[in-house]
Amino acid sequence: LGITPRAPLDLMGGYEWYRIEAVGKPESTSFTAAVAALDHFITEAVTAYPVDPQRLFLLGFSQGSIMSCAFTLTQPARVAGVIAQSGYLPLKSGLKIDEAGLKGKPFILTHGVFDSMIPIQAGQAARDGLTHLGAEVEYHEFPMGHSVTDESLAVIAAWLKKQLAF
């Protein structure tokens, strides 16, 4: 079962989860509201479609990736793991991190070497930060920009299949 929330804020014909002050720096009020909205969405989804938290994975691209990480940093027991594509770890956003709950929590991170929106260094820092927090991290870089490719999706699919094979 795949359920995808739409980000709440309008952005030039698309949507965003929160406003940005600078690259890697979410605007505090909208970021806090976005994390609360995602929390509410997950609560409603699990009520409507009873899902075992041990089989619930969050997947996101760009801001969706950042939101998936933010939620899991604060409430790791509510999800099985995270698939984060082309994002960063919002450690400086004022989140109260549940370090004990992150121990062994599986994450897969993918990032484009040529990403001009969120530099590759942000992906590498996310990998290092999650590893430091005790998460189980698989990290892949691909010859792409700020995008998703068949190659990156194949790696993600293989990882997810492995995670669900218990």
Question: Each PLM stretch: what is its role?
Answer:
Residues 7-11, 89, 146:
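Alpha/beta-hydrolase active-site loop signature
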Residues 108-111, 115:
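Short beta-strand/loop motif that positions the catalytic acidic residue
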Residues 54-102:
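Primarily recognizes the serine-hydrolase "nucleophile elbow" in alpha/beta-hydrolase
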Residues 6, 59, 83-86, 110, ...:
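Alpha/beta-hydrolase-fold catalytic nucleophile elbow
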Residues 108, 121-166:
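C-terminal catalytic histidine-bearing segment of alpha/beta-hydrolase fold enzymes
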Residues 1-55:
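Serine-hydrolase catalytic machinery in alpha/beta-hydrolase-like enzymes
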Residues 13-17, 95-97, 151-154:
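Short aromatic-enriched loop/helix-cap "lid" or pocket-rim segments at secondary-structure transitions
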